[in-house]
């Protein structure tokens, strides 16, 4: 049950019945303060303005025809015309009993379901994954998991960079090492970052090697069998590096989700031909460009989208247009979500516009750039190693696990080593993921191991610890699979607040799915964890008399189920002991 949506429908209907224009939105939001109710409808002001009517007068008319059944115990008008709704305890109690009995927590599958293509992670296979790939990978995956949970058909597209001039350089270096010593080649490929660096040094310093690298580009593009075989070997090793990172991060991407740049190579000439046929191409100094009036530069000059260089080479824009067309015609997408750095905003908007003008995508297909900010160091600059190098994601995860190990061992010195390592892995990966996911994706954030591993504040360890405390209530009381009888009491203010929070889970997930913002879910789980802490301190559970004891156990079980489900949608594991 989506409580916010239900109230929106009922109050919108009442607005219309009270004389407001049809389709007037109720604008229902959760209230910021308990004295203003559980939800507040703010749509009366806009409707009253359209009717040239006093807002409070219209609000009174709305209340006269509003039928919330047994949902609300009180509805009142506040201020210039806000409608405050106070939910009924009895209604919430009955609703939560239904939530408790349903493995899906009464969250239905969306209908109609959509086909949603999600483009995320997309590392360049010439190098190992670095910290810059973290945001796209984990934010995209959290949204994918949420969309799938809501019943949509999600098609993951890992648009990896496996093509381009840098691969000529890498293949030439592979061949050089192979000729010298096969074992040396295998050792070098174990560290792709160093391999790339060595190849680049040869390219910059050895003219003969540079010529060889350029020849390899030509060979690769012409389909030379030996060259393609060498390239496939490199790509396979590079993808294995990515898969190791995905597994450690509990990211759902697999080899089957890889749709590389090279997959579109054969279609690139067709893209150019179709753009030309539509009259969209302009030759500018030998390059083929699409000029669109809606994209202007500083001097009010129209910015070009270059799709073919003067030397005949294709660009990212050409591949992106081919991918766009594939996602429309083959994958039949209703929505395409691109989890790509905010700095690519102009590029993607140009691609979307060119794709629509060329008829590559239908007008009703939604193209959404889920832009995200940068990961910064303590100095407020892009996160780097101490010597100014790129932070490899694998190294960062290893350090996170090591730091988590030290924290857990410090609190549990007698814990067996195997359990210690398992908890350190879960907490370390969760800390890195949650620290990122809990920030609004459009913002930059400062990476801090100390902050993300803290047991205080909006962190993974805090939420994971809340879950383990709930589980401990049941262990301590030796409460097994009991059949709970009776209603939830909700006598204390914190019990009531928890009931409202638990009933908001559905609308939170729909916000994540529609906006592509997992920080909404993180904020919800943090609030739920904080409220549980207040409940745990102020409301005895196991020592309470019946029926209060059973009521509080039911509330505790609902909290545990919701925390576990919410963390699972973020790709974060729960622990019963920390």
From Swiss-Prot:
Gene Ontology MF term list: arginine-tRNA ligase activity; ATP binding
Enzyme class: ligase
Alphabetically ordered keywords of this record: Aminoacyl-tRNA synthetase, ATP-binding, Cytoplasm, Ligase, Nucleotide-binding, Protein biosynthesis
EC number: 6.1.1.19
Main location: cytoplasm
Residue numbers covered by motif 'HIGH' region: 123-133
GO BP annotations listed: arginyl-tRNA aminoacylation
Pfam families, sorted: Arg_tRNA_synt_N, DALR_1, tRNA-synt_1d
Family annotation (InterPro entries): aa-tRNA-synth_I_CS, Arg-tRNA-ligase, Arg-tRNA-synth_N, Arg-tRNA-synth_N_sf, ArgRS_core, DALR_anticod-bd, Rossmann-like_a/b/a_fold, tRNAsynth_Ia_anticodon-bd
Reactions listed under catalytic activity: tRNA(Arg) + L-arginine + ATP = L-arginyl-tRNA(Arg) + AMP + diphosphate
Intracellular or extracellular location(s): Cytoplasm
Any GO CC annotation of this UniProt entry: cytoplasm
Keyword Aminoacyl-tRNA synthetase: yes
Family to which the UniProt record says this protein belongs: Belongs to the class-I aminoacyl-tRNA synthetase family.
Complexes and interactors: Monomer.
Family annotation (HAMAP family): Arg_tRNA_synth
Protein name (Swiss-Prot/TrEMBL): Arginine--tRNA ligase
Record organism: Hahella chejuensis (strain KCTC 2396)
Gene this chain is encoded by: argS
């Amino acid at each position: 049950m989506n409580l916010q949506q239900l109230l929106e429908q009922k109050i919108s209907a009442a607005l219309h019945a009270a004389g407001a224009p049809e389709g007037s939105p109720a604008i229902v939001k959760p209230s910021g303060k308990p004295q203003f109710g559980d939800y507040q409808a703010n749509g009366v002001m806009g409707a009253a303005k359209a009717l040239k009517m006093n807002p409070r007068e219209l609000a009174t008319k709305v209340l006269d025809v509003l039928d919330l059944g047994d949902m609300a115990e009180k509805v009142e008008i506040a201020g210039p015309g806000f409608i405050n709704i106070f939910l009924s305890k009895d209604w919430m109690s009955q609703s939560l009993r239904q939530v408790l009995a349903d493995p899906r927590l009464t969250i239905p599958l969306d209908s109609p379901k959509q086909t949603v293509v999600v483009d995320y992670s997309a590392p360049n296979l010439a190098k190992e994954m670095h910290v810059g790939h973290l945001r796209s990978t984990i934010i995209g995956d959290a949204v994918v998991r949420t969309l799938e949970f809501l019943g949509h058909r999600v098609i993951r597209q890992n648009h990896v960079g496996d093509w381009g001039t840098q691969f000529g350089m890498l293949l030439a270096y592979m061949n050089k090492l192979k000729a010298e010593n096969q074992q040396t080649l295998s050792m070098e490929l174990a560290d792709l970052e160093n391999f790339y660096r060595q190849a680049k040094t040869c390219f910059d310093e050895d003219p003969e090697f540079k010529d060889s690298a350029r020849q390899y580009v030509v060979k690769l593009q012409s389909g030379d069998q030996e060259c393609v075989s060498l390239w496939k070997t490199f790509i396979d090793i590079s993808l294995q590096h990515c898969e190791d990172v995905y597994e450690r991060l509990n990211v759902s991407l697999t080899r089957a989700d890889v749709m590389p740049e090279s997959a579109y190579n054969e279609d690139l000439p067709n893209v150019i031909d179709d753009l030309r046929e539509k009259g969209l191409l302009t030759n500018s100094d030998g390059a083929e460009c699409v000029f669109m009036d809606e994209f202007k530069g500083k001097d009010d000059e129209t910015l070009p989208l270059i799709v073919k260089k003067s030397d005949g080479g294709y660009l990212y824009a050409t591949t992106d247009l081919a991918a766009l067309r594939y996602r429309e015609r083959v994958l039949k997408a209703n929505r395409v979500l691109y989890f790509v750095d905010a700095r690519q905003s102009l590029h993607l908007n140009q691609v979307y516009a060119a794709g629509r003008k060329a008829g590559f995508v239908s007008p009703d297909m939604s193209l959404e750039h889920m832009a995200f900010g940068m990961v910064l160091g303590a100095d407020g600059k892009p996160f780097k190693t101490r010597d100014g190098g790129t932070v490899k994601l694998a190294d960062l995860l290893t350090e996170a696990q090591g730091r988590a190990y030290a924290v857990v061992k410090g609190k549990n010195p007698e814990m067996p080593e195997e359990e210690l390592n398992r908890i350190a892995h879960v907490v370390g990966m969760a800390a890195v993921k949650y620290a990122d996911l809990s920030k609004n994706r459009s913002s930059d954030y400062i990476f801090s191991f100390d902050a993300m591993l803290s047991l205080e504040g909006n962190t993974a360890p805090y939420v994971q610890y809340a879950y383990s405390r709930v589980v401990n209530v049941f262990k301590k009381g030796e409460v097994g699979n009991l059949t709970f009888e009776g209603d939830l009491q909700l006598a204390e203010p914190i019990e009531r607040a928890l009931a409202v929070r638990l009933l908001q889970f559905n609308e939170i997930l729909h916000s994540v799915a529609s906006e592509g913002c997992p920080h909404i879910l993180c904020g919800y789980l943090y609030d739920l964890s904080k409220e549980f802490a207040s409940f745990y301190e102020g409301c005895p559970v196991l020592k309470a008399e019946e029926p209060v004891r059973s009521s509080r156990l039911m509330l505790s079980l609902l909290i545990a189920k919701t925390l576990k489900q919410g963390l699972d949608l973020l790709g974060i594991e729960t622990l019963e002991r920390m």
